[in-house]
Amino acid sequence: MLKQMFDQVREKSPLIHNITNYVTVNDCANMVLACGASPIMADDKEEVAEIQTICAGLNINIGTLNSRTIESMKIAGTRANELGHPAVLDPVGVGASTLRTSTANELLKAVKFTVIRGNISEIKTLAVGTGTTKGVDADIADRVTEENLDEVVAFVKRFAGRTGAVIAVTGAIDIVADAKKAYCIYNGHPMMSSITGTGCQLSALTAAFVTANQEHPLEAAAAAVCAMGLAGEIAHERLTPQDGNATYRNYIIDAIYHMDGNELEHGAKFEVK
């Protein structure tokens, strides 16, 4: 299943419209290229509807919000829905400020998202209006562990049912779920948290995967999360004592570039609940 998801990305090379944050925009573009898709980074309200029309999927990331891009996100999201394009929302830091929270909620009302990806604190904030967001990282009280895994899976499935979206909760244990089925994913490496933007890259990667596999959004999102985690493992094995987080970031992108469906199929670590 995972092999097919990745192979479809390489075969179809979908064009993905990214309205993302300026901290990680270059990394997101390179991640989309590395997986075999193509990126466009456009965020002016005068062109986003037109750009979305020529694309096949949309990735919206609220990491560096401003009044100009908020309007652009709504326009692009509405156009994506009109065209039947998959849309991914990355609600970076929702709950940390009133602007982020209100914008994320407005986007959820205005746009039908295929996938919503965030850490557990961000997803909790969207789902119940509360959470313990501190910046863009999940508070220790909100971490997914083996002990609370079943409880979190049930919560994520409920939120998926309410939104109609696949929900991807990423952390030490990743959960990707729709209302009925959840993938609990164990790929990744702790050093990935030392890089700014691995989550942003994953959302861009997810947009490419779900766009190339529109009939299987749950499996496509799970494949993207597995691929990113596996890339983190492969990249870490390459590091020398002189290397740091900048080298690690590049190695993760390289790992996706060289990865194929067979490697993903054999390297993925997950269980289904």
Placement of each model-derived feature along the sequence:
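Conserved post-catalytic alpha-helical subdomain immediately downstream of the catalytic base
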Residues: T196, T206-Y248
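Active-site cofactor/substrate anionic-group-binding motifs, chiefly glycine-
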Residues: M31, C35-G84, L89
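Charged C-terminal helix
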Residues: L230-K273
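Glycine-rich phosphate/adenosyl-contacting loop at the front of the ribokinase-like
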Residues: M1-M41
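Conserved phosphate/ATP/ADP-binding segment of small-molecule kinases
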Residues: R100-A182
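Buried hydrophobic packing segments
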Residues: C28-M31, S203-V210, A221-A224, I252, ...
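Short pre-catalytic strand/loop immediately N-terminal to key active-site residues, enriched for Gly-Thr
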Residues: Y186-T196
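Glycine/small-residue-rich loop that forms an oxyanion/phosphate-binding "nest" at active or ligand-binding sites
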Residues: T69-G118
